[in-house]
Amino acid sequence: MSSVEPMAVSIRADVAPVQVRKLGTVDYLAAWDLQREIAEARAEGGPDTLLLLQHPAVYTAGRRTLPEERPADGTPVIDTDRGGKITWHGPGQLVGYPIIGLAEPLDVVNFVRRLEESLITVCAELGLPTGRVEGRSGVWVEADGVRPARKIAAIGIRVARGTTLHGFALNCDCDLNAFGSIVPCGIRDAGVTSLTAEMGRTVGVGEVIDRVADAVLDALDGRIAVRVEPAARVESAR
């Protein structure tokens, strides 16, 4: 049973508004370069930024990815410096990169919880109950007796110089078959799902992008309370 942790305070170091940039479809490596550019500027006093976009189909691997979790057919994978394991990005999936200067003392787990809570809130607004699974990061649809727990949103971040990079991916109306070639997030005993698959109607990125932007900002600044549940596993580099 979850309790509610009061969070009337922002996790951000800056009180200035977050700049939200909706970029459409962007190549993964180009977006990664942009993240690093913005993060460097943020570390030097620039604004907090939330990038919202989609990627052309691509597999990316976090630092804990094992060889056997990669595509068996040798499909190329981009190795990244984020936490977590391997995942897929592609059309129909909303990717968010919050590049945020965290308040001291840094609480990276709390940051991840706030991202999770923002996406849990969006799913609830759409009529889909979701939550967390103990010991696993991300947002999940609960097992229903027929199907196992299913991940609908993945989270993988890195923190450098007190600034966050990478972020979350919410499956809206994407091709779930793309996850079949890998062990998504290194988890073998659970499934992957999307808003469209769960709700029985098409739920595209365009329908949720504004909701996600608002919820992420509300969660980061403490206007959405975070339920107290087991901590997400994250990695930080200073």
Curated annotation (Swiss-Prot):
Family annotation (CDD domains): LipB
Any one Gene Ontology BP term: protein modification process
PROSITE patterns: BPL_LPL_CATALYTIC (PS51733), LIPB (PS01313)
Biological or metabolic pathway of the protein: Protein modification; protein lipoylation via endogenous pathway; protein N(6)-(lipoyl)lysine from octanoyl-[acyl-carrier-protein]: step 1/2
GO terms for cellular component: cytoplasm
EC number: 2.3.1.181
Disulfide bonds listed in the record: none
Pfam family, one: LplA-B_cat
Reaction it catalyzes: octanoyl-[ACP] + L-lysyl-[protein] = N(6)-octanoyl-L-lysyl-[protein] + holo-[ACP] + H(+)
Compartments (UniProt record): Cytoplasm
BPL/LPL catalytic domain boundaries: 44-224
Entry's Gene Ontology molecular function annotations: lipoyl(octanoyl) transferase activity
Cross-referenced PANTHER family: LIPOYLTRANSFERASE 2, MITOCHONDRIAL-RELATED, OCTANOYLTRANSFERASE
Annotated family: Belongs to the LipB family.
Function summary: Catalyzes the transfer of endogenously produced octanoic acid from octanoyl-acyl-carrier-protein onto the lipoyl domains of lipoate-dependent enzymes. Lipoyl-ACP can also act as a substrate although octanoyl-ACP is likely to be the physiological substrate.
Additional record remark: In the reaction, the free carboxyl group of octanoic acid is attached via an amide linkage to the epsilon-amino group of a specific lysine residue of lipoyl domains of lipoate-dependent enzymes.
Protein name: Octanoyltransferase
